[in-house]
Regions:
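A cytosolic-side transmembrane-helix exit/cap motif
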Residues: 33-41, 62-68, 89-96, 162-171
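Hydrophobic alpha-helical transmembrane segments
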Residues: 12-19, 43-44, 69-74, 113-117, ...
Length: 176
């Protein structure tokens, strides 16, 4: 990351953002922080996957993080939550036995799946609002709105899946 920053003269905050992302990924399960075992796994992953990763792409493409990116950040964060909850669902039994303190362990897969649908709905609603209320941006938010319907519809179709059946659950998570 440091060599990339030097070679391509990216913004001063490129390397610190990469470092934060790496530290969050490393300390998700590694001591001494062990974020996933202390109830911080979802928020750290949602931030890393929903804000830092798209932020890095945006930063590399545009040379800076500007208001267009920050307008998108709440929706990206919602999809970061969507991501982490989906990947936790098939592993809830192992997480419980391993001592992780995540939302799936605490509240169960049924409520967790409701949170998956909720987070996807929030992401879509944000993109709908951006499409309606912001027209001055160089970004056409309508495309975000259209593509946000894919995980929402797939998730809603999966509402009838027997979440107790691990094979069906894994199939649904792959679809999500």
């Amino acid at each position: 990351a440091l060599l990339f920053q030097i070679r391509f003269a990216t913004a001063w905050y490129f390397f610190p953002l990469v470092l934060i992302g790496n530290l969050l990924g490393f300390f998700y399960a590694a001591p001494p922080l062990r974020l996933a075992y202390r109830g911080f796994g979802e928020i750290s992953t949602a931030f890393a996957a929903g804000v830092l990763m798209p932020g890095m792409g945006y930063l590399v493409a545009n040379s800076s993080l500007n208001e267009d990116f920050f307008v998108l950040t709440p929706a990206f964060l919602a999809y970061g939550v969507f991501f982490i909850l989906n990947v936790e669902m098939p592993d809830v039994q192992g997480d419980r036995e391993g001592g992780k303190l995540n939302l799936m362990v605490k509240y169960g897969v049924e409520k967790g799946y409701a949170a998956v649908i909720f987070s996807s709905s929030i992401g879509t609603l944000i993109f709908v609002a951006l499409s309606i209320f912001i027209s001055s941006s160089a970004i056409d938010y309508r495309w975000f709105m259209v593509f946000s319907l894919v995980p929402l519809v797939v998730g809603l179709v999966g509402v009838g899946v027997k979440l107790g059946d691990r094979a069906q659950l894994i199939r649904q998570v792959k679809g999500n």
